[in-house]
Amino acid sequence: GTEAARFQTGLLLNAVRNSVFVGVVSTLVATALGTMLALALTRGRFPGRQTLGALFYLPVVIPDITQGVSLAIFFNLVFEAVQRALGVRLVPGFGTIIIAHIAFNVSYVLIVVRARLATMDPSLEEAASDLGANRFQAFWRVTFPILMPGILAGALLAFTLSLDDFVITFFNAGVGTTTLPLFVYGMLKQRVPPEINAISTLMILVSILLVGASLLLQRRSART
């Protein structure tokens, strides 16, 4: 009936809001962390740099189900430790989903930004220093604008992956934290209404547009 359809629409809109919220928060944090790590691993000179750099490629090659289960076990151990130490009972929710999404998105941002850093001419920063700029000024006025297309490309890729993620979210979601992919899966288990086809098509189109924009930014940044 009309009431059932209205209720279903309400659940759908809530799932969309949840997906956008998780996507935006995890993308912002992952982009900041990924950029800083890319700079540290490219410019830094510290022991274990190569090993650390290789470790950040693991989320790209490890299957989603392995990551999802591993993170769920990790959160469960943390929750048990907190309950024993402080007597506070923690449960999975937006926090666990966002942390899980940050965990795999950092790697993608790092790879994209690091690729941009590799093509950057170091003499530009040296020229800025020769003109009297300190390291901070040289970074913000020279390095950051050059890195910006790479950072934006990494952010768009991270947001797309977060928006579409089902497996990792499935293992780390809590009550009332249904994202759009989880909502679609829940509806598919009951029946396949026409709305599912429309939502799925829209998700595919949004993903293609975001990935296309990310690739375009990467291509443009490679030329400059």
Report each predicted region and the residues it spans.
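Interhelical loop and adjacent transmembrane-helix boundary motif
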Residues: 1, 163, 169-213, 217
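Short hydrophobic faces within alpha-helices
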Residues: 16, 41, 58, 123-131, ...
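A structural signal for multi-pass alpha-helical bundles of membrane permease subunits
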Residues: 18, 67-86, 156-161, 173, ...
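Transmembrane alpha-helix signature in integral membrane proteins
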Residues: 8-41
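C-terminal transmembrane helix and the adjacent membrane-cytosol boundary/short C-terminal tail
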Residues: 114-129, 135-142, 197-224
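Membrane-interfacial helix termini and adjacent extracytoplasmic/periplasmic loops
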Residues: 4-5, 9-13, 43, 48-49, ...
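Transmembrane alpha-helices
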Residues: 58, 96, 102-103, 109-116, ...
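Cytoplasmic-entry segments and transmembrane alpha-helices of multi-pass inner-membrane transporters
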Residues: 33-71, 125
